[in-house]
Every structure is written in C-alpha cells, then in structure tokens.
Amino acid sequence: MKSTTTVEPFETVEPNTTNREDVSQLGDAPVAITRYGIPVRVSSATENGWEVFDPCGDLQTVSKIVPIENTQVVLDPGHGGKDSGAIGHAGLKESVVNLKVAIATSQLLQDKGFPTFLTRMSDYYISLDERIALADAANAKAFISIHHNAPASAASNTPGTEVFAQSKDSESARLSGLLHKEVFEALKGVKGVQWTSRWDAGALRVLNSQGSDAYRLVRKPETTNALIEVGYLSSPSEGAFMAKDEYVQIVAQALATA
C-alpha cells in the first residue's frame, strides 16, 4: 500500500487457519470483502490467511475475508480519497455523490434479486487499473462506472446526462442506451432545476487519436461496461439538487431499472 493512499487499514496477521478456504472454492469470481469492508481481488490462500490485492493493486495479507460470488452487476463509484473528482455546490465532492448513488443503486438491485459488487464502499483512493481488474475478476454481466460532470456547460431545458460505451461492443452500446434513457427521463421530470448540457449529450462513443476508446475505464474492461456522467455537479442549480437524498434515490432507481 502506497503511503499517499487514504484507505482503511489492512490488518497485521498471525498464523491462523480458521475461516480459510482454498481460493479455487471461490468459484469463477475470486473477489471478496475484507473485515474492514474493502472490496478486493483474492490471489491465494496462505498459511497466514489470504493474499489479496489492495486498492493500489499491491499484494497484502489478511486473516479473514467474505467471498462474493455470483455477481451480476459491478458498480464503480468514480474517484475517492485524494482524488475527489469535481467539486460542486458548497464544496460537495463528486466522489461522495458517486458513492451515495452507487450504494443506493446496489441496494435496489439486491432487492430485485441481482447480486452486486462495489469497487469501493467508502471514501478512499483506488487506481483505475484496480477498478478494472475487480470488475473483470467478478465475472459480472455488467460494469457501470458512476460519475458527475464538470465544468458546467450551456444552460439547457433538459439534463446533460452522458453515457459512454465501448466502440466495438454492441452489448456495451445497448447498456449505455438503456442507462441514458432511464436516467434522462427520470431527471427530466424534476421541477425547479436549471440543467446544463453539451449539444451532443446522450449515449456516446468517444475515440482517441489512435481510433480506440478515449476513456480507459471504457476501453480496458473485458466486462460489458458503460461510464455515466449523470449531470453537472459544477452547475450551482444541479449541484444543490445533487446534495439532496431525493436526487440520490431518483438516480439510483433509474439505474436499477435500466
């Protein structure tokens, strides 16, 4: 673990063979939650417990884990810890809003019978590569990275929701379209918010100069994925709305419905 990373501590372990299983018994998705509530990839069972990859992608040893199996949806709350993302109304951090939306969405999906897995469950930094590795290790059907945009764009009568898909993946395009439709329609019905939007907002595919997907979180995962910028946290009106529990529930319901 790099010293600059803010994260709940990994434990110092002593030899202990209780609560251990062979890593092969974790099934096709060797991911787990540590006793500190940190989602991790599992490398192997050892005499001292388990070797797992921490949020920086470094190997650490822990004495106890809770295996997570049969995941259908991985939710990735963007940013976290030293990487706060956009800063909005009254200092509201994007990383905090992303996490609230992800947790609420996870609960709704679980209630519908869809097992979920979050790449982070509190406010700490996790590398892009480890987010991607967690999503692929979970062997889920979908990976959704949740974000909020900045800087503010032009004033609009409708939300500026953007969802990015893998350029060569039809399932990613379908997922992005469904996410955009549900979130856009849910937010469009909210009264009293001055929206902002780019002219081309929607379900998008964005390429870099090499002709591949511009965003690493879209380009790299093998899991069907989409990255959503729900709205503009940097807009004073939208930012004030995003600070409310009402906003979190509206967006979570839309994401879970998609």
Where do the language-model regions lie?
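Catalytic-site microenvironment of enzymes
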Residues: 1-258
